UniProtKB/Swiss-Prot annotation:
Gly residues bias spans: 166-176
Keywords: Acetylation, Cell junction, Coiled coil, Developmental protein, Phosphoprotein, Tight junction
Pfam families registered for this protein in UniProt: CCDC85
Chain's gene name: Ccdc85c
Organism: Mus musculus
Protein name: Coiled-coil domain-containing protein 85C
Consequence of gene loss (knockout): Disrupted in the hemorrhagic hydrocephalus (hhy) mutant. The mutant animals shown sucortical heterotopia and non-obstructive hydrocephalus with frequent brain hemorrhage.
Length: 420
């Protein structure tokens, strides 16, 4: 059984110590055999120790070799991990740069969204303001039109009253022969007697003139100025037939025309009729495009009484004469202003009516300019884009109002009128 290396080393050390500790006198007393035996034993122990030391060295070298291999493997692993770490670091830098770019782009989009929303909101507010201004202007125009209509009716009533007073003062001589004609004139107006008898004729300046014939004589004809008669041959009606025709014409006329005399030679009547026709045509222009044609035709027909429509047709353009006689085959074009020759002189026009005509012309010019400027501002495509953007904004506001009560309460104040 071999001794352990530590035990052998300890024994060799002990033997050497024993030999070194033995004094020289003791060594001299030993015999040669004893010295040789002790020497051989010490050499054997030394050889054993050297063998054990060599084994230990081989073991240590083997372990060192293993440790070196492990160190190399760990170095390789460490290098690989460092490479992976470097790649991950570069990837993190790339992702961080991408994140920074994404944040910057998001901020840009956010600023663009705020700017676009502000611009859309401003445009919507401006459009709503324009709509409110247009509505207010339309209401003002409607009120002015109503006032002008009332003014025209008041002027007609005043003229009828003045004509009635003049006719009552100048027609006392032929009362017996005008009994039937006066009963018919009560329906058509006091001045109707001037066409069938010797009644007074009011010229608008406060004076009255009478004709020479008797009230019921058939040789007395109604005098009409040549400028107001339609072109072509004219047939003069006799007394009874003319009176009957005028009575039937006045009965078929509109209610507010029955109180207006039919004296076409009167300057006020010559001026009031085209003015009333123009007011009705202005009202007809506000109808939708589908109803414009028939509405203008009805307005034209309504503006002329059956008795004096021929004289007023003569003052209209040929296209309107065909439409009034045959009916509207297509939408009627816009009626121009009545010619100045139809009106009486400026000195005979009432001041209020002249002012009303100036107001009408100013409003017509403003409406035409406003319509042209509105059409030139935006094209149809731009209008469609603005309407779509407004609808998107209102949908967003509706979604926000469904979640936030404050926005719902703010929108319930009717500040805006909803999507276009």
């Amino acid at each position: 059984m071999a001794k352990p290396p530590a035990v052998a080393a300890a024994a060799a050390a002990a033997a050497s110590e024993e030999l070194s500790q033995v004094p020289d006198e003791e060594l001299l007393r030993w015999s040669k055999e004893e010295l040789a035996r002790r020497l051989r034993r010490a050499e054997g122990e030394k050889v054993g120790l050297m063998l054990e030391h060599g084994g230990l060295m081989r073991d240590v070298n083997r372990r060192l070799q293993q440790h070196l291999l492990e160190i190399r493997g760990l170095k390789d692993v460490n290098q690989r991990l460092q490479d992976d770490n470097q790649e991950l670091r570069e990837l993190c830098c790339f992702l961080d740069d991408d994140r920074q770019k994404g944040r910057k782009l998001a901020r840009e989009w956010q600023r663009f969204g705020r700017h676009a929303a502000g611009a859309v909101w401003h445009e919507v507010a401006r459009s709503q303001q324009k709509l409110r201004e247009l509505e207010a202007r339309q209401e003002a125009l409607l009120r002015e039109n109503l006032e002008l209509k009332e003014l025209v009716l008041l002027l007609d009533e005043e003229r009828a009253a003045l004509a009635a007073a003049g006719g009552a003062g100048g027609g006392g001589g032929g009362a017996g022969s005008r009994s039937s004609i006066d009963s018919q004139a009560s329906l058509s107006g006091p001045l109707a007697g001037s066409a069938a008898g010797s009644g007074a004729r009011d010229v608008g300046d406060g004076s009255s003139t009478s004709s020479a014939g008797s009230g019921g004589s058939p040789d007395h004809h109604h005098h009409v100025p040549a400028a107001l008669l339609p072109p072509g041959p004219h047939k003069v009606p006799d007394g009874k037939a003319g009176a009957t025709r005028r009575s039937l014409d006045d009965l078929s006329a509109p209610p507010h025309h029955r109180s207006i005399p039919n004296g076409l030679h009167d300057p006020s009547s010559t001026y009031i009729r085209p003015l009333e026709t123009k007011v009705k045509l202005l009202d007809g222009d506000k109808l939708p495009p589908q109803q414009a044609g028939s509405g203008e035709f009805r307005t034209l027909r309504k503006g002329f009484s059956p008795y004096h429509s021929e004289s007023q047709l003569a003052s209209l353009p040929p296209s309107y004469q065909e439409v009034l006689q045959n009916g509207p085959a297509c939408p009627v074009p816009e009626l121009p202003s009545p010619p100045s020759t139809v009106y009486s002189s400026a000195g005979q026009k009432p001041e209020a009516v002249v002012h009303a005509m100036k107001v009408l012309e100013v409003h017509e010019n403003l409406d035409r300019q406003l319509q042209d400027s509105c059409e030139e501002d935006l094209s149809e495509k731009e209008k469609a884009i603005v309407r779509e953007m407004c609808n998107v904004v209102w949908r967003k506001l509706g979604d926000a109002a469904s979640t936030k009560p404050s926005i719902r309460q703010h929108l319930s104040g009717n500040q805006f009128k909803g999507p276009l």
